[in-house]
Regions:
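Terminal, low-structured helical/coil segments at or just beyond the last alpha-helical repeat
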Residues: 191-248, 341-366
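Helix-start (N-cap) detector for alpha-helical repeat units in TPR-like alpha-solenoids
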Residues: 21-25, 56-57, 90-91, 123-128, ...
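Alpha-helical segment of the N-proximal tetratricopeptide repeat
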Residues: 23-54, 64, 68, 230-252, ...
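Structural marker of alpha-solenoid helical repeat scaffolds
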Residues: 51, 85, 119-123, 157, ...
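Structural signature of tandem alpha-helical TPR/SEL1-like repeats
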Residues: 34-44, 69-81, 103-115, 141-150, ...
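TPR-adjacent "capping" and linker segments in tetratricopeptide-repeat scaffold/adaptor proteins
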Residues: 17-24, 120-128, 217-234, 296
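Canonical tetratricopeptide repeat
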Residues: 27, 61, 95, 126-133, ...
Length: 366
């Protein structure tokens, strides 16, 4: 197909353009496309492309309009003709990949996304877009961890890529169930979006729903209804004062504070830290792990809290629990090298060698 397009273009160039170079048709196509009159836009862009064999932009716009109409075969033909005009265009190559994805030609899509995302000479913004497309392709193949890393790479390339934050939000909310991270990611996406319809959905539906879910989760914790923050703060202060002089009494103060207010970070953290050394039975270990989880729920951006919790879980032979703590930590800060290194170690301990290699490769990029 592509060879035929190149041959046709060559003949057209030899013949030369007539007095009508398609500029008027292109202008009408632009106006129709802006008004979402897609059928008219297609006809106008098609006419512009036919009249000017070197009009690259008309061919790209024709491909986009056909995509919007769901005419994928026509879109593929249009983008191939655009690439024939400008074989070096990374934008056209990325569009070719996105159209191939819609046509379920995943091999071509994968190759196109890799070509663009790995080309260091290209603008970072374009490479970031290719990374997001690659992540979507990986999600289609249920390669969740690979998609996650691709989205992290997309953000590193362009922190203003709304689509990357948007897809990270969905991953955090729907796959990993990390609503606190999802809230941050959707908020970031909403600040960067230019599509008013999608922005409205995120700001008026998605974000309020997550906030309400987090509020209900906190309110549903045992003891939350009758919490006494003032008494808990006083007991935490007393516990901290006794930490070196009388560790046993200090631990008792933290336990009392935690009972008074399960939503206090200081109380949950103090309880978990003071009991982690002596927790041996399954019941004691579970209690400490719950306290660590309560602590990170209150300070979801504290990498130290996650790592301390994960190390305790590893010491008590709970690597799956450690993996979850660290995965949640990375949802908030995927560029923390210490957390990433511990995550790789934990994955290897779980026998997840392929995943460990994936995250280790990402760590080396930082």
């Amino acid at each position: 197909m592509r060879n035929k397009i190149i041959a046709a273009l060559a003949l057209a160039v030899i013949a030369g353009c007539g007095p009508d170079d398609g500029a008027a048709d292109f202008g009408k196509g632009e106006a129709a496309y802006a008004a979402r009159d897609l059928q008219t836009a297609v006809q106008c862009f098609k006419a512009a492309a036919a009249k000017n064999p070197t009009n690259f932009t008309a061919r790209v716009k024709l491909a986009l309009a056909n995509v919007d109409l769901g005419e994928i075969d026509a879109a593929r033909e249009a983008v191939e003709s655009a690439i024939a005009v400008d074989p070096a265009s990374a934008e056209a190559r990325l569009l070719e990949g996105n159209i191939a994805y819609l046509a379920k030609d995943y091999a071509l899509a994968k190759a196109a996304f890799a070509d663009v995302s790995s080309a260091r000479q290209l603008p970072r913004e374009l490479r970031s877009k290719a990374m997001v497309s690659q992540a979507v392709l990986e999600l289609t193949a249920t390669m969740v961890e690979r998609a996650r890393v691709s989205l992290w790479r997309a953000v590193r390339l362009d922190r203003r890529n709304a689509a990357a934050w948007y897809h990270l939000g969905y991953l955090s909310r729907d796959t990993f169930r990390f609503e606190d991270a999802a809230l941050e990611q959707f908020q970031m996406a909403s600040r960067l979006m230019t599509d008013p319809v999608r922005m409205k959905t995120v700001m008026q539906d998605i974000i309020p729903t997550i906030r309400e879910s987090l509020r209900a989760k906190a309110a549903g914790k045992p003891g939350a209804a009758g919490r006494d923050p003032g008494a808990a703060a006083k007991l935490v202060s007393e516990g901290e004062g006794l930490a070196k002089k009388d560790p046993k009494k200090s631990a008792a103060k933290f336990a009392e504070a935690y009972a008074k207010d399960p939503l206090s970070y200081a109380a949950a953290w103090g309880f978990a830290k003071s009991r982690s050394g002596s927790a041996k039975s399954d019941r004691e270990i579970a209690r400490v792990l719950t306290a660590f989880q309560d602590a990170v729920d209150q300070r979801p951006n504290s990498q130290l809290t996650y790592r301390t919790a994960a190390r305790f879980a590893l010491e008590r032979r709970r690597p799956i629990r450690a993996e979850k703590f660290l995965s949640q930590a990375l949802a908030h800060d995927p560029e923390d090298k210490t957390t990433l290194a511990l995550y790789v170690q934990t994955l290897r301990r779980l026998g997840k060698t392929a995943e460990a290699r994936l995250f280790e490769a990402y760590l080396k990029e930082l």
